[in-house]
Structures are given as C-alpha cells and as structure tokens.
Amino acid sequence: MKARMTALYAIGHFCIDLACAFFMFHCVRDSETWVTAALLYNFCAFALQMPLGLMADRLRRDRSFAVIGCVLVCLAALLRGSPLPLSILAGVGNAFYHVGGGVAVLHTYPERLGPLGLFVSPGAFGIFLGTLLGKGTLPMLPVCAVLLLMAGLLLVFAKGVRPPEMDMELRTAPLAAIGCLFLVVLLRSYLGFLFTFPWKTGAWAVIAACGVVLGKTAGGYVSDRIGMKQTALLSLGAAAILFLLSGNPICGILAIFFFNMSMPITLRAAADALPGLRGFSFGLLTFALCLGFLPAWSGLPAPSGGWFLALGAAVSLLLLLPGLGRKR
C-alpha cells in the first residue's frame, strides 16, 4: 500500500509539472507579458509552498492538498486567454500538489530517503517534456483529462498515513543547520540555470534530463544504504571533479547525475530538523529554489565554464555537511 501510494504521488508529480510547463509554453510564452507571467508562476509555485506547508502541518490533510493542486492546474486551462491569471493559478496548483505529495511521503517513510527521491525526481522530466509539447500543437484537453484522472486515483488509492502529533515550535530547531540546508538548495537552484553546455541539444538534452531524474532517485536509495554524509561526500565530490570535464557530454551528464543526488538528502535533513513542521520544512527549501533562479531571470551576467560549477559543487558540500549535523 505504501509503495503504491508513493508511486501514485511520483506519477502525479510528473503529470503536474508537465501540465504546468505545457500551459505556460502553449498559452503564455508568446505573450507580451511572458517575463512577468513566468516570474509570477515561479513565485506561486515555489515561494507559496512555505505558507501552504505550514497550513498542511496544521490541517494534516496531505492528500487533499495534492488533489486540490491537480484541480487548480486543470482550471488554469480555462484562462488560456489571460496569461497572468493562468500563470498564477497554475503556480498555486503546483504548490498545493508539491506540498501535499511531499509531506505525505515524508510522513509515510519517516526514516527513509529512497521513496522521497522517487517522489521528487519525475518533476524534472515532466518540465522537460511539457516544454517540448507546449511548443507543439497538442490540444489542452488530454492534459486536463490526465490531471483529473490523477486527482481521482489519489482520492481512491492514496490513503496515506496520518502523521502523529508532534511539537510544532521553531524555538528548539537547529537553526544553523537549517540555514546551511537552505543555502545548499539556493545554490543548487542557481547553478541549475548554468547547465548550458554546448552539447546539450537533441538526444543529449534528453539524456541530461534523465540524468537529473535518475540522480535524485539514486540519491535517496544510496543514502538509505550507506548514509547521508557518505552519499553527500561521494556525489558532490564526484560532481565537482566531473564538472571540470563537462565539455565532454558523458562527463557533463555524469556531473549532473551526481550533483542532483543531494536533493532528497536536503529535504530529509530539513524534515528531521523540524519533525513537527515537515510541510513548512519542505516549503522552506522550495522558497530557496525560488530565490535561486532570480539572478537568471533578472538578466545578471552569469559565470561560464565548468570551473564555476565545480566550485559550486564543492561549496555545496561544505555547506551540506554541517547541515546534516550528527547524521551518519
């Protein structure tokens, strides 16, 4: 039952991110308000997860949040002639789904990272595929139908585990460790916009997207086997070395794979640091994602070259280790 629930939430994550990317590129990309709409979407999709996560902690209705997310994104399709309202509604729906699904998996597997990595990983490929489809001629109706089907499946099959009552105070939280985790995610988000390798076209672009997905998945399951610190050392250390050779597509894809292995580690560590506020911890790190893409959207000049990505991976490791505290 737990495995089925996690698989459903993971598939839903793929569908919700695909739908949002599809709607944005199908309905908004060519409008005069594209830049504003994209900023509004990203703010709603990522920054709003923090207050929504706190709300989920209070209400303890994880599945309901995920279902609401599917419905809201579906309703956004009705606003195809209004780019800004569509972007806002799609972003809010995306935030609802991520909070609902993420917190449900955190509650269901309080000691494991593998299922968490499985949940977060499909979103990257959903965005990639949704962007491609959004630039084509696929009608919106099939996408909406899939979202409604997903909402129905979650209602029927994703029963989940009711979280235990726990302390929901911040005063006893290890704030320094949480701050380190926040900075790791912010840096990961920023560096992700610098993965503009000259070889990243055609089939190599598809393989690179798969590298993101598989890296996040592997990070969770490897951490369950050898521990979070060992996984962080191996993955980010390997990423730092391989980024120096990222002009070669094989080395670049391996670097992306290893770099993304830290994703479930940061989410699990933050949730463990705030055990009664898992929704808030999830949203706090997605707020860091939101801040991380602001430099790219603002048009600030970005450093180029594998050396900067290698430096970023090394700094991420130096921040992540104290963020993990005494965890093995």
Range-by-range predicted roles:
Residues 35-57, 206-219:
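Central cavity-lining transmembrane alpha-helices of secondary-active solute carriers
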Residues 57-70, 224-237, 277:
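Cytoplasmic membrane-interface "Motif A"-like loop-to-helix N-cap segments
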